[in-house]
């Protein structure tokens, strides 16, 4: 299995590790390493963790941190979910339910430097992604995400790059420190239960106003009913929330599409 290392530089983030100057000159052997187990959540959404299907739903609704009950149980949970069931209606053969991540952080006067290391779960290098192949007449796409119909039917191989995504909050998003990404994943979003239809998106005032053609991650504060993506607040209301810092930074590193040019996507989650 191939080990992948990713180093990201993020402005104005406080970290409690060794001082650094330039990413290329950091001696990572002197920076403390935190070992974290990541697990596959399937389609466990904001709504699911607050429903009767989740034994800890009342605690979640009361603001209890997920780690209160699940710390140290990540691998077992991921291994169970990935096999299939209500939280994974389309299990992928051979997919691992968890991953071991090594995390390091350093900083200087201007930037924070985050380094992540893990072993790819793919049979090929984690930098592999969709190809264009010439069949003698035309160029055709070869390889698709494993949940795509053509892969599920065996007509195309499942080929997709490794990715590393982090969300960062400065304390202004209620419950994010306790429940993290479960505030952002909702029923109705892409690849989630009750996925949106094109007609629903086209008829939605907020998504039309912000020129979106599908439903992605959002924070509860952006909806009048946090559990209903259709109930978006006005553009003016959301602009006020954003101006007050009520969003989380979303940074995505892609082993194929961004690593080659030494970059990562700089986004955010709110609406």
Language-model regions, residue ranges each:
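Secretory pathway export signals and precursors
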Residues: 11, 62-65, 177, 181
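Histidine-centered active-site/metal-ligand motif
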Residues: 70, 80, 181
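Surface-exposed, glycine/proline- and aromatic-rich loop segments on solvent-exposed faces
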Residues: 96-270
């Amino acid at each position: 299995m191939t080990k992948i290392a990713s180093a990201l530089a993020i402005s104005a983030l406080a970290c409690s590790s060794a001082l650094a100057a330039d990413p290329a000159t950091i001696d990572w052997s002197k920076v403390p390493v935190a070992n974290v187990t990541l697990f596959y959540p399937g389609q466990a959404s904001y709504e699911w963790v607050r429903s009767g299907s989740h034994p800890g739903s009342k605690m979640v609704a009361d603001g209890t941190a997920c780690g209160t009950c699940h710390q140290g149980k990540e691998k077992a949970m991921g291994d169970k979910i990935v096999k299939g069931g209500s939280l994974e209606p389309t299990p992928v053969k051979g997919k691992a339910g968890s991953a071991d991540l090594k995390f390091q952080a350093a900083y200087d006067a201007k930037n924070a430097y985050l380094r992540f290391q893990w072993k790819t779960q793919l049979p090929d290098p984690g930098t592999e992604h969709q190809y264009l192949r010439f069949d003698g007449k035309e160029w055709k796409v070869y390889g698709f995400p494993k949940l795509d119909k053509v892969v599920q039917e065996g007509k195309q191989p499942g080929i997709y790059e490794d990715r590393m995504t982090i969300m960062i909050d400065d304390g202004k998003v209620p419950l994010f420190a306790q429940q993290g990404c479960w505030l952002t994943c909702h029923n109705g979003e892409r690849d989630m239960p009750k996925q949106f239809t094109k007609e629903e998106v086209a008829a939605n005032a907020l998504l039309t106003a912000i020129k979106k053609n599908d439903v992605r991650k959002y924070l509860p504060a952006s909806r009048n009913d946090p559990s209903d993506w259709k109930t978006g607040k006005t553009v003016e209301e959301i602009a006020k929330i954003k101006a007050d810092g009520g969003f989380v930074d979303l940074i995505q590193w892609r082993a194929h599409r961004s690593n080659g040019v030494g970059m990562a996507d700089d986004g955010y989650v709110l609406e």
